[in-house]
């Protein structure tokens, strides 16, 4: 009579997420024990580990690497001279695993011709905009496009019904790529449509990050989806007892429907993103819908990732847009950034906007953990007289990172940057808007992981009507925020020391 409750209990606790967490914890404990056991009483081994740490420090000094990242590791090695060098060898390499890097580069190089720039698409841009567009198409390489309609959504629950409508209209294919997919109201609504469309013969594919979705999906998720003819790729699977490194996650949020419609932004496929579940107060996010020529960039981004792991297409032409808006609303340039190369594309786009701004730059970001170059760019823009405003969460999802974000407030405020905290809840949007003619909406946080370690995406809008829509959203959000003053930033000596340590180690958090 107790069999069913017992089965339910064990099935609940013995899921993949629980097993993974337990195995990782055991692995960490085992490594610490092994380190203690092997070094105790072995003077020669202690000396060898210290020598390794010195060599790693010298290597970092010479390495062409982000300075904040190098300093963070040098500080950690200095604090832990016995363990620091070994920790860097285990966790410090920014480059993705060789297999992952080789697969993705091979596919991207094979399809470079699919992204050939067309000068006529940028002939309406001014010199500054053309320079930025040229940079993204050269180092992305993702060209800019006219003949694209855009619609900005100031929250996830505004986007969700429109997304469902577009999914219902799909006739040829649906591509989805997300960091988080979690069972619940939002995913249930999408899944029902995907299953129905797959049964009708629509090509339905899903890429989701295995680490990001670890706690939100059942262990048999892929099997269930494949049985419904929804093909899946769990990106960079988490394998405990093989690697503890959780870097190089697929943080992108992309939907492509029939090659004609695309979505991106900060919204994942989980209930908190549409406020069907309250976690940290009201969840403020942002997304954008594109229709027309620029959708092609997102189609290629998705297919490159898909074919790196499940080779299928050599010709992307059947997935090209078949419908273009009659009128052109500015220029749109979707792009992606990845750790596959040494080009910090996402950071450079943000830096360029700050450097070229004349009147204002308004920024949404859930986290602020940046290097000196980004910090100086924010301060310099404000010192030039540009109205620089940062909007961050009032209720954090990660308290340590929230404290780290606040540790940047004093130098920014002294330079003239205005900082706001969104008091109704958690702000998860990642947007830049400047001078009524330039904006970015995407998945890219202002932290080290987004800017250097993860696969990210965004859409640059040049002189598009939705630039104004984003500006108006920021201005409507500011009255709901608390503006931070210098007097709010007083802290105790221990607090100041903690903030300094967090700043030094910020690239590692």
Question: In which residue ranges do the predicted regions lie?
Answer:
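Phosphate-/nucleic-acid-contacting segments
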Residues: 360
């Amino acid at each position: 009579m107790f069999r069913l409750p017992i089965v339910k209990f064990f099935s609940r606790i013995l899921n993949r997420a629980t097993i993974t967490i337990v195995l990782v914890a055991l692995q960490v404990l085992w490594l610490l024990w092994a380190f203690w056991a092997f070094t105790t009483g072995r003077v020669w081994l202690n000396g060898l580990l210290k020598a390794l740490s010195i060599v790693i420090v010298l290597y970092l000094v010479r390495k062409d690497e982000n300075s904040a990242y190098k300093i963070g590791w040098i500080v950690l090695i200095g604090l832990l001279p016995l363990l620091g060098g070994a920790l860097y060898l285990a966790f410090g390499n920014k480059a993705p695993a060789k297999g992952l890097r080789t697969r993705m580069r091979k596919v991207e190089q094979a399809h470079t011709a699919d992204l050939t720039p067309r000068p006529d698409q940028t002939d309406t841009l001014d010199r500054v905009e053309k320079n930025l567009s040229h940079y993204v198409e050269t180092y992305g390489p993702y060209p800019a496009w006219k003949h694209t309609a855009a619609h900005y959504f100031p929250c996830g629950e505004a986007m969700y019904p429109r997304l469902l409508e577009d999914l219902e209209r799909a006739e040829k294919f649906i591509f989805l790529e997300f960091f988080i997919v979690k069972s619940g109201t939002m995913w249930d609504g999408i899944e029902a449509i995907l299953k129905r469309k797959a049964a009708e013969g629509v090509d339905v594919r899903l890429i989701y990050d295995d680490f990001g979705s670890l706690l939100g999906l059942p262990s048999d998720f892929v099997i269930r989806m494949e049985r419904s003819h929804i093909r899946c790729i769990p990106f960079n699977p988490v394998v405990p007892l093989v690697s503890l490194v959780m870097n190089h996650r697929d943080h992108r949020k992309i939907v492509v429907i029939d090659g004609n419609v695309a979505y991106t932004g900060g919204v994942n496929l989980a209930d908190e993103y549409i406020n069907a579940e309250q976690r940290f107060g009201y969840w403020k996010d942002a997304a954008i819908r594109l229709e027309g020529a620029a959708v092609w960039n997102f189609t290629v981004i998705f297919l490159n990732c898909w074919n790196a792991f499940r080779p299928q297409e050599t010709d992307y032409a059947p997935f090209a847009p078949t419908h273009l808006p009659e009128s052109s609303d500015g220029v749109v340039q979707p792009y992606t950034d990845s750790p596959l190369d040494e080009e910090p594309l996402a950071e450079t786009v943000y830096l360029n906007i700050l450097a070229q701004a004349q009147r204002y730059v308004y920024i949404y970001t859930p986290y602020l953990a940046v290097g000196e170059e980004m910090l100086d760019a924010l301060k310099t823009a404000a010192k030039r007289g540009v109205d620089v405003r940062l909007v961050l969460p009032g209720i954090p999802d990660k308290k340590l990172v929230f404290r780290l974000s606040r540790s940047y407030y004093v130098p920014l405020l002294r330079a003239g940057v205005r900082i706001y905290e969104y008091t109704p809840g958690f702000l998860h949007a990642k947007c830049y808007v400047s001078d009524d003619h330039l904006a970015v909406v995407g998945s890219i946080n202002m932290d080290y992981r987004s800017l250097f370690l993860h696969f990210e995406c965004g859409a640059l809008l040049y002189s598009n009507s939705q630039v104004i829509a984003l500006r108006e959203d920021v201005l409507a959000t500011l009255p709901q925020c608390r503006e931070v003053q210098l007097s709010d930033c007083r802290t105790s000596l221990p607090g100041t020391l903690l903030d300094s340590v967090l700043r030094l180690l910020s690239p590692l958090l």
